[in-house]
């Protein structure tokens, strides 16, 4: 979450008058994240989140995201629910941006994910995948392999400003992943596609909610697992934590076993996941709007993760002989 577009108090008051959420007591921008402008609303009826959708989020995709949250919540997945205005609409316009109000979830995201947290997110991800099986709406993943070349083109001229040689490193990896090695015949379904620690809330050791579905789409289910391996299983010094990976994979596969092809493909999927986030972070790092209340994330973190994944020989390197085995 972040703030790119500010909202004047009188403009916000007029906007909120269309909703039955009580009187506004206070509001503040939320600086975390990199994609949309988000505000915490405190009203006489509690707390809500106001999101103004920016950048990579197409307005035509918003009904998908909002309907998905409703579907998952109805299926027992703890996630925010869209709040309708008095006309029954969940999508509106504020400050020239598409906007929605969603419910507030209790909990905090883990700043230093533990093994227990990794197990929790593995289980929650699998349950979300299962709950998404009967969601009727579809959305292609615009940030899968076909979407990486345009990102590279947007950043390549200045990539070496971040690290000398980065452009050639990215070009070589992209060419490899575009060479026909990327799998297309693995189980597919609804994926979150951005399940980082700041998108999972915990109360104690229990997952209390999953947030931020603005990258959700239909793609390889194991790709979502690979994204989580990269996001949850590296330490602050960039070392890969096999114990965390084992916990995440074991918890996931207790709910939804990975088949043999998914297990074999997981290291390749993790390479692709690392490149995808490296590229989007690089573009963001090089193009932060002046004066924006935003904290761009370091692309070099994902350079290191990609280098690790390039050297993974198989799923054993993630701490398991067969995904689903409990250590």
Curated annotation (Swiss-Prot):
A Pfam family: APH
GO biological process, one term: threonine biosynthetic process
Molecular function per GO: ATP binding; homoserine kinase activity
Reaction(s) the record says it catalyses: L-homoserine + ATP = O-phospho-L-homoserine + ADP + H(+)
Organism for this UniProt entry: Rhodopseudomonas palustris (strain ATCC BAA-98 / CGA009)
Pathway: Amino-acid biosynthesis; L-threonine biosynthesis; L-threonine from L-aspartate: step 4/5
Keyword set, alphabetical order: Amino-acid biosynthesis, ATP-binding, Kinase, Nucleotide-binding, Threonine biosynthesis, Transferase
Identification of the protein by name: Homoserine kinase
Top-level taxon in the UniProt lineage: Bacteria
NCBIfam families: PRK05231.1, thrB_alt
Disulphide-bridged cysteine pairs: none
Recorded family membership: Belongs to the pseudomonas-type ThrB family.
Record InterPro entries: Aminoglycoside_PTrfase (IPR002575), Homoserine_kinase_II (IPR005280), Kinase-like_dom_sf (IPR011009), Pseudomonas-type_ThrB (IPR050249)
Entry EC no(s): 2.7.1.39
């Amino acid at each position: 979450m972040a703030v790119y577009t500010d909202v004047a108090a009188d403009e916000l008051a007029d906007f909120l008058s269309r909703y039955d959420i009580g009187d506004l007591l206070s509001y503040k921008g939320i600086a975390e994240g990199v994609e949309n402008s988000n505000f915490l609303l405190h009203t006489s009826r509690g707390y809500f989140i106001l999101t103004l959708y920016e950048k990579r989020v197409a307005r035509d995709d918003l009904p998908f995201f909002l309907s998905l949250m409703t579907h998952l919540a109805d299926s027992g997945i703890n996630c925010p629910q869209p709040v309708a205005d008095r006309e029954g609409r969940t999508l509106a316009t504020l400050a020239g941006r598409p906007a929605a109000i969603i419910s507030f979830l209790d909990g905090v995201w883990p700043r230093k994910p533990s093994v227990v947290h990794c197990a929790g997110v593995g289980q929650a991800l699998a349950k979300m995948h299962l709950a998404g099986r009967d969601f009727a709406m579809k959305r292609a993943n615009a940030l899968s392999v076909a979407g990486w070349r345009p990102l590279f083109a947007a950043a390549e001229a200045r990539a070496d400003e971040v690290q000398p040689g980065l452009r050639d490193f990215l070009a070589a990896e992209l060419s490899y992943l575009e060479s026909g090695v990327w799998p297309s015949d693995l189980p597919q379904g609804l994926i979150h596609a951005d399940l980082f620690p700041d998108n999972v809330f915990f109360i104690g050791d229990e997952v209390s909610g999953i947030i931020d579905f603005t990258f959700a789409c239909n793609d390889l289910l194991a790709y979502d697992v690979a994204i989580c391996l990269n996001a949850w299983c590296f330490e602050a010094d960039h070392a890969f934590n096999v114990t965390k990976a084992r916990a995440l994979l074991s918890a996931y596969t207790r709910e939804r076993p990975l088949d043999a092809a998914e297990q074999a493909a997981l290291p390749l999927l993790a390479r692709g996941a690392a490149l995808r986030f490296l590229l989007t972070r690089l573009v963001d790092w090089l193009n932060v709007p002046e004066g924006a209340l935003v904290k761009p994330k370091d692309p070099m973190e994902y350079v290191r993760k990609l280098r690790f994944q390039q050297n993974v020989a198989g799923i054993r390197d993630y701490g398991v002989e067969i995904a689903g085995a409990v250590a």
